[in-house]
Amino acid sequence: MKKVKLIYNPMAGNRNFRYYLDQFIEKFQGVGYEVSVFRSAQEGDLDLGVEQVINQDYDLLVVAGGDGSVNEVINAMMKHDIDLPLGIIPAGTANDFAVHLGMPADIETCFDVILEGEVKQVDLGEVNGRYFINVCAGGLLANVSHEIDLEFKNTLGKLGYYLKGIEQLPKFKPIPVEIKTKEQVIEEDIYLFLILNGKSAGGFKKIGKKASITDGQLDLIAVKAQPLHEIALLFIKILQGEHLADENIIYLKDSCFEINCLDQSYSSSSSDVDGEKGPQLPLQIFLHSQALKVVSNISNV
């Protein structure tokens, strides 16, 4: 009999996934799986669920939660050298990576996709020793998901992120950074940067429209310091996916980046990694090609 481990975060999103547990078990038992479930009891304990897979002959690992939960599970998989296909159920507030894989918003439909979808080898990013599947970001908006109240986030969803970001804009100071690739060094005052593995971040589905999780490269997008009215125009371009050629955008592709802050007063600036608080600058970012197996709902990821 095949074995599947389901790991879920009961606090993710609207907290409704628990109502689908029996349907999940019934669906997978119906096609010959022995089902084991791990329910997160506190922040940071999803690693314990992944540990339960070690040397237990599992065939499939499934995580239900948002980008942060997926990130935690993936880091645990890499830590314990677990080479199993990962199915993702988008049960969080932000589900950018699941969207990239074509996973449906309907939870029960996801069960079918995980059972019938294609297993793909995809790239992983690493920043200062921590893995990320979708994005590493810094600057404006990077701390939004860490500062926003959980109830506020769960009630308003992505709108909560945007409202908090707008609140930050008038008082945010540009960050002077040095961006290094294998071939060039750029010094610029910027409002924010994104290192993308997938195409979307923060619900913006077209922000990394040229990115691919199978191309062996990461996409860097940085927004240069500029007047607020120009940011408003750039925001419209981002929504339309027409921002990469804008003069106020730095756009690079490479397999590694180094980002340093040129002003010591910003030395405590932290990053965001898949929606969770990340390391402080400076950042060393690398790509690991085809490091993870995921279940996808689309052929070309």
Please identify what each model-predicted range represents.
Residues 152-160, 209-229:
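Gly/Ser/Thr-rich active-site loops/lids in small-molecule metabolic enzymes
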Residues 2-4, 84, 255:
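Nucleotide donor/acceptor-binding cores
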Residues 68-84:
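Short Gly/Thr/Asp-enriched flexible loops that form oxyanion-binding sites at enzyme active sites
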Residues 22, 26, 51, 75-79, ...:
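Short, well-ordered alpha-helices that flank and scaffold nucleotide-derived cofactor binding pockets
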Residues 181, 187, 212, 222-301:
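ATP/nucleoside-binding phosphotransfer catalytic cores, i.e., glycine-rich phosphate-binding loops
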